[in-house]
Amino acid sequence: TAPAIAAAALQSLKDSDGSMLLVLSADHVIQDVDAFHEAINIASQQVQSGKLATFGIVPTNANTGYGYIKSSKENSNGAHKVEEFVEKPDLKTAQTYLEQGNYLWNSGMFMFKADVLIDELTTHSSDIVNSVNNAINNATQDLDFIRLDKQAFESSPSDSIDYALMEKSDNVVVVPL
């Protein structure tokens, strides 16, 4: 997901300096739309101040099928500093996370300003930014579509945004859902 998100951010910067990106997974069901809108508003405030935001789902059980986000217990207007991303745990560890109360399921949904994302991604995974930037600079326009340069885009490391950036940055907050 990192190259695709980087492409969206770089392209949006061509159109507007202050672009914000909201990256949503297609496999989520949002049951409480009002709470989701409130979470987006909270994240937006954090993002405007230069943070990278992710959304964590408050766990309802000790689940071994999800990665977790350990958050600070301090609350900054509804957001918490991310202390650690953790891989899918065994059942005993998941139960401990549930009991501690400051672990959230990793939703894979994010919000950031395009320029902040690119700055952070350049710091932590510059090879992705360089390849994707080359793909955009050599893109072609096809009706309403932008066709990235295939060879340049394929030269980018295939990495998730979690591994390429979110787990490496100390500038990440999580908003509970």
Question: What are the functions of these language-model segments?
Answer:
Residues 1-74, 123-124:
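Conserved beta-loop-beta/alpha segment of the NTase-like Rossmann-fold superfamily
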Residues 68-177:
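Catalytic core of tubulin tyrosine ligase-like
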